Amino acid sequence: DIVLTQSPASLAVSLGQRATISCRASKSVSTSGYSYMHWYQQKPGQPPKLLIYLASNLESGVPARFSGSGSGTDFTLNIHPVEEEDAATYYCQHSRELPLTFGAGTKLELK
């Protein structure tokens, strides 16, 4: 199985600042020009919401302050500027092969 390691486990960011979340895969999730890494946001009592697919593509309806980058084994989610509604837990997930796996999550809090 591909193991996804997220860092940090939690972070506190002031309104208007940048939040950066990293995800490292135990082996490459990129092939044939695509990186099969995705980012989700989850708030308490709600299902995960897809933010970014294929490493850098913004899901429809997601604000442009969310962006994703990376390839191979190293990926990043950036949120800038952070808004109050962004307080949530963020997960990376790969779809390179079965089983699909998720990172352990990063909890974003506002200062």
From Swiss-Prot:
Residues annotated as coiled-coil are none
**Which keywords label this protein?**
Adaptive immunity, Disulfide bond, Immunity, Immunoglobulin
Give the domain of life: Eukaryota
Complementarity-determining-2: region residues:
54-60
Where do the record's region annotations for Framework-2 lie? Answer: 39-53
Sequence segments annotated as region (Complementarity-determining-1):
24-38
Instruction: Give any single GO term for biological process.
Output: adaptive immune response
- Where is it found, in Gene Ontology cellular component terms? immunoglobulin complex
- Which portions of the sequence form the region Complementarity-determining-3? 93-101
Give the span(s) annotated as Framework-1: 1-23
Q: InterPro entries annotated for this entry?
A: Ig-like_dom, Ig-like_dom_sf, Ig-like_fold, Ig_sub, Ig_V-set, IgV_Light_Chain
Renumbered residue ranges of the record's region Framework-4: 102-111
Keyword Cell cycle among record annotations: no
Disulfide bond sites: 23-92
Region annotated Framework-3 sits at 61-92
The name this protein goes by in its record: Ig kappa chain V-III region PC 7175
What organism does the record attribute this protein to? Mus musculus
